[in-house]
Regions:
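Bacterial Sec-dependent N-terminal signal peptides
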Residues: 1-25
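GH16 jelly-roll
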Residues: 20-259
Length: 259
C-alpha cells in the first residue's frame, strides 16, 4: 500500500511539472515550413487524402477542391454539381503528409482561416503509422463545428475512446477570431501534449501511465499531419447545402524542434 501511495504521489508530481512548466520561445528552432507559395502542392511532402468511410466520406482529388492564391491553399467543401459519375452528394478537399513527412516531439503551428456552415467540420490533426486506430493516438490540433466561436483541441487514444476515460481531461475549447486567421499549435513532449490557440495555452494533456496501449501512446511513434474539410456526422450535425460552398484557408504550416 505504501509503495502504491508513493507511486501515486510521484505521478501527480510528474503531471504537475510537465503541465505547469512554461516553455520559452527561445528553446524552439524552426526546422521546416510550408507556405503554399507555388500555386500547387509539393508532392514530395503532401498528398490529397483519398475517400473513405466516416470523416472521409466526401473527400476527393478534383482540382476545384484545392484552390490556390498567391500564398494560401483553400480546402473546399461544395455540392457535387460537376461530377455525375461520382455518387457523393458533396465533395471536400483534404491533404496529408502520410508516408512522406513525419513529426515526433516538437511544435507544430498552422495559421488558418475558417468559413462556417451548418454541418461543416474543418480539422487539423495528426495520426501515427502504421499503428491501428486508436491505439497509436490521435492529436486534434483544431476542430471547428458549424458557426461556433470556438474550436476544440483534443487528445484521443484507446484510453479515451474505447475505455471512455476523461481523467486527465482530454480536450478543451478555445475562442477564435471567427472572421480572421488564427494560429493553432501543439507541442509534443515525451510526457505531455500542450495545445495553443493564438499563443494562449488551452490545455495540457499529461502522461499518467505509459505503454503504447495505455493512457499516453503519443511518445512512441512519429505522426503525420492531416488538414481537411469535412461535412456531416453525428457530432457536427446535418449539412445545410444552401450554405455551401465553404472552405478552410491555410496560410502556412511550421515545425519547430528544441535547440
Amino acid at each position: 500500500m505504501k509503495k502504491q501511495n508513493k507511486l501515486a504521489i510521484f505521478l501527480v508530481c510528474a503531471t504537475f511539472v510537465s503541465c505547469t512548466t512554461p516553455q520559452q520561445n527561445s528553446q524552439w528552432k524552426l526546422t521546416w515550413e510550408e507556405n503554399f507559395n507555388d500555386g500547387k502542392l509539393d508532392t514530395t511532402i503532401w498528398s490529397t487524402i483519398p475517400r473513405g468511410g466516416g470523416w472521409a466520406a466526401y473527400l476527393a482529388d478534383y482540382p476545384e477542391l484545392y484552390q490556390f492564391t498567391d500564398s494560401t491553399i483553400q480546402l473546399m467543401a461544395i455540392k457535387n454539381t460537376n461530377h455525375p459519375e461520382d455518387t457523393a452528394r458533396y465533395l471536400t478537399g483534404g491533404i496529408w503528409t502520410r508516408y512522406k513527412k513525419e513529426f515526433k516531439f516538437g511544435r507544430i503551428e498552422v495559421r488558418a482561416r475558417l468559413k462556417s456552415a451548418n454541418g461543416y467540420w474543418p480539422a487539423i490533426w495528426m495520426c501515427p503509422d502504421p499503428i491501428p486506430y486508436p491505439y497509436g493516438g490521435e492529436i486534434d490540433i483544431m476542430e471547428h463545428l458549424n458557426h461556433d466561436d470556438n474550436v476544440y483541441q483534443t487528445s484521443h487514444s484507446y484510453y479515451t475512446i474505447n475505455l471512455q476515460k476523461n481523467d486527465p481531461p482530454k480536450y478543451a475549447t478555445a475562442p477564435i477570431n471567427k472572421n480572421d486567421y488564427n494560429i493553432y499549435a501543439v507541442e509534443m513532449y515525451p510526457d505531455s501534449l500542450v495545445y495553443y490557440t493564438n499563443g494562449v495555452r488551452s490545455i495540457c494533456y499529461p502522461k499518467v501511465n505509459g505503454g503504447k496501449d495505455g493512457q499516453f501512446p503519443f511518445a512512441y511513434d512519429p505522426f503525420h499531419l492531416r488538414i481537411d474539410s469535412q461535412l456531416g456526422g453525428s457530432w457536427v450535425g446535418p449539412i445545410d447545402p444552401e450554405q455551401l460552398p465553404v472552405y478552410m484557408e491555410i496560410d502556412w504550416v511550421r515545425y519547430y524542434e528544441k535547440q
